[in-house]
Amino acid sequence: MRTFIAIDVNEEVKKQASEIIEKLMKRGFGATWVSEENMHLTLFFLGEVDEQKISEIAEHLCRRVRGFPSFSFTVKGFGYFKRKMSPRVFWLGVENTDRLMKLYEELRNELSHHGFSFEEKFVPHITIGRVKYYPDKWEKLIEDIDFPPIEVAVDRFKIYSSTLTPTGPIYKVLYECQFEGGLIRYA
């Protein structure tokens, strides 16, 4: 199954993000927009992993971060990744990431013991849309878009499955790892 590891964001972030998506749609941008229930900060995309292996990985990851102190990061700002001269992905920025980066490194080290390697640099962000089409002079149309700072408390991460459909991905929580409470298995 197609899997990834993520941190959920709070309702305030989801609400503000939805307002930005609405503005972008009204301004003529077309994208596969991320629904509120699917908004998250991806730590790792693992790809296809069989059920038995993901169970083992979840147990080891959770053991690795047991007792990790809870922390927060700030969601702030709006931006995009480009392909050539075109917007490819719209995202919300993430600041105050020292503890987030420590968590990322702990998980990355554990995942390396399970045969995973991650070559791309981790750039924390929250994807809100994968751009399909955009209007002329699109850069002018997003100059005034910003995201006010919102703090997100973190005391756990989740492992999700992702099923791709014509209307967008369907995410399902498989495991939740609470820093103080241990592993919770869904499914």
Curated annotation (Swiss-Prot):
One of its GO terms (molecular function) is RNA 2',3'-cyclic 3'-phosphodiesterase activity. It holds the Pfam family 2_5_RNA_ligase2. The active site is at H40 (proton donor), H125 (proton acceptor). A motif (HXTX 2) lies at residues 125-128. It catalyses: a 3'-end 2',3'-cyclophospho-ribonucleotide-RNA + H2O = a 3'-end 2'-phospho-ribonucleotide-RNA + H(+). Its EC number is 3.1.4.58. The keyword Cytoplasm does not apply. A motif (HXTX 1) lies at residues 40-43. Keywords: Hydrolase. One of its GO terms (cellular component) is cytosol. Belongs to the 2H phosphoesterase superfamily. ThpR family. Hydrolyzes RNA 2',3'-cyclic phosphodiester to an RNA 2'-phosphomonoester. This is RNA 2',3'-cyclic phosphodiesterase. It comes from Thermotoga maritima (strain ATCC 43589 / DSM 3109 / JCM 10099 / NBRC 100826 / MSB8).
